């Protein structure tokens, strides 16, 4: 009886093992071994806990994030390309996984003023506004790799004074880290030698079922925010901070993204869906 039980347990363990993948099917590093504008680019892999991240120094961009599902099968949960050439000359979306800036999002009328001086930036959005830095930004340049460990990578770029109209030499460092607890963290550090605007961000497109697998409209989401920032028809903030109560922007109680996305609402119409900033509520002590 004992031998029979052991055999059953061993067979069961083998069956469970067969349902789990050995690990993520990573993008080959040779797909990114190239030069862009005379500078070498590469693909780097870091890992922490159950999460594996692949990053390229072209645009300091996240190429893939592999995580296991409840059955232990790994999927890449961000959308992107599998080779460097498609990032250099994208067949579609330019900003997949990229570091965007020096000013993420839009600059109205492609200009801003500091101390009475007007600075003009590229009108690369509807020929009116500046989007994510301009035609070059931080996503179309090769970053220096300062250090790489098993779980982190540090990238650096000096955005020179006057590039695409922005004042100041902007010394920018980004650190991607995957912790032993399977947390993905991004740390930004920027210094400048002139007054300027800095608003750096990362631009991943998440698809939690796996890359390009279905819509996000049935994802359940909650946002601890009582207010959001309305935009005009060209996606420029109006300057108002609006209450979410009674609007499709109220995610304080979790519900699917698609539950109210089809409602008749000026803000949804302006953005053709959700493309807004929420003002996160401070936690009470």
Language-model segments: residues:
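Hydrophobic h-region of N-terminal signal peptides that target proteins for export
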Residues: 9-17
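Intrinsically disordered, low-complexity segments enriched in polar/charged small residues
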Residues: 7-8, 208
């Amino acid at each position: 009886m004992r031998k029979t039980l052991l055999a059953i347990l061993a067979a069961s363990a083998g069956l469970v093992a067969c349902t789990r993948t050995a690990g993520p099917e990573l993008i080959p590093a040779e797909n990114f071994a190239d030069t862009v504008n005379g500078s070498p680019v590469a693909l780097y892999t870091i890992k922490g806990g159950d999460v594996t991240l692949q990053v390229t120094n072209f645009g300091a961009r996240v190429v893939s994030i592999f995580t296991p599902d409840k059955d232990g099968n790994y999927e890449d949960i961000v959308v992107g390309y599998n080779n460097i050439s498609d990032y250099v000359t994208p067949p579609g979306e330019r900003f997949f996984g990229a570091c965007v800036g020096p000013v993420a999002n839009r600059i109205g009328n492609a200009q801003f003023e500091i101390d009475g001086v007007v600075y003009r930036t590229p009108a690369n959005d509807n020929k009116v506004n500046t989007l994510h830095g301009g035609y070059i930004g931080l996503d179309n340049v090769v970053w220096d790799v300062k250090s790489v460990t098993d779980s982190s990578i540090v990238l650096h770029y000096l955005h020179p004074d006057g590039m695409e109209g922005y004042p100041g030499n902007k010394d920018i460092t980004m650190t991607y880290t995957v912790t032993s607890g399977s947390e993905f963290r991004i740390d930004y550090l920027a210094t400048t030698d002139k007054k300027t605007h800095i608003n750096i961000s990362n631009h991943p497109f998440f698809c939690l079922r796996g890359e390009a697998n279905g819509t996000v409209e049935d994802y359940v989401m909650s946002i601890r925010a009582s207010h959001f920032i309305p935009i005009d028809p060209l996606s420029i903030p109006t300057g108002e901070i609006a209450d979410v109560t009674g609007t499709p922007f109220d995610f304080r109680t979790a519900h699917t993204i698609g539950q109210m996305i089809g409602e008749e609402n000026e803000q949804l119409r302006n953005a053709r869906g959700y493309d807004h900033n929420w003002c996160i509520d401070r936690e009470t002590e």
